[in-house]
Amino acid sequence: MAFLALFALAASAAASVCQRTLHDGWRFRQGSSEIWHPARVPGNTHLDLMRERIIDDPFFRLNERAVQWVDKEDWMYETRFTPTVSELSATNQVIVFKGLDTYADVYLNHQRICEADNMHREWRCNVKGILKEGENLLEVYFKSPIRRNIPKFDALPYRHNTGPDHSQIGGIFDKTISPFARTAGFEYGWDWGPRLVTFGIWRPV
């Protein structure tokens, strides 16, 4: 009987959990621009820019060099959603980002709910008291890892040896900054792929 009671409680708790993905209606823009473009989530900035024909395929010929401006900019993503009655009445209200690449501030209704700095983990954002009835605005502001990490490189009293880091292609000369970012190392270039230091909501929300 005790087992059955515990099982019933667990089943009841599981049934009371409601969740959904927030993958629809996203758009993005360059931080210094007011022009918005449609975005896909999960995804990344380079793919969104390619779909909008703002950049060419960086895997073709020498196009890699023509897209190095992307990682020097900040990028803004946003979507709007309306919570259900069940979501608004839930005891716990959490927005979970399974993956953010990489430096990002997340805002819900203009209140910061997360400051991300690691591509390799998930981020759980408590939105109790911020989630509201009607339309909610969810924003993710990605910051340039280049501008963020060059000062760290410059502050070192020595020069470190690092693995593949095509900083010359990136236009930052000998500033091999990849060790400072909790980001996939291949983004900074490898012998099998181009240097594409990208941004994005790369896993489900």
Regions found by a protein language model. Name each.
Residues C18-S32, H46-L47, E52-R53, K72-P204:
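Accessory beta-strand-rich segments of carbohydrate-active enzymes
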Residues S32-S33, F60:
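Carbohydrate-interacting regions of secretory-pathway proteins
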Residues D57-W69:
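Surface-exposed, low-complexity/disordered Ser/Thr/Gly/Pro/Asn-rich loops and linkers
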Residues A2-A15:
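Cleavable N-terminal signal peptides of Sec/SRP-targeted secreted and luminal proteins
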Residues P42, P58, N126-V127:
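Helix N-cap / beta->alpha transition motif
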Residues I35-G43:
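Short Gly/aromatic-enriched secondary-structure transition segments
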Residues M1-A5, T45-H46, P58, E115:
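Terminal low-complexity, poorly structured segments
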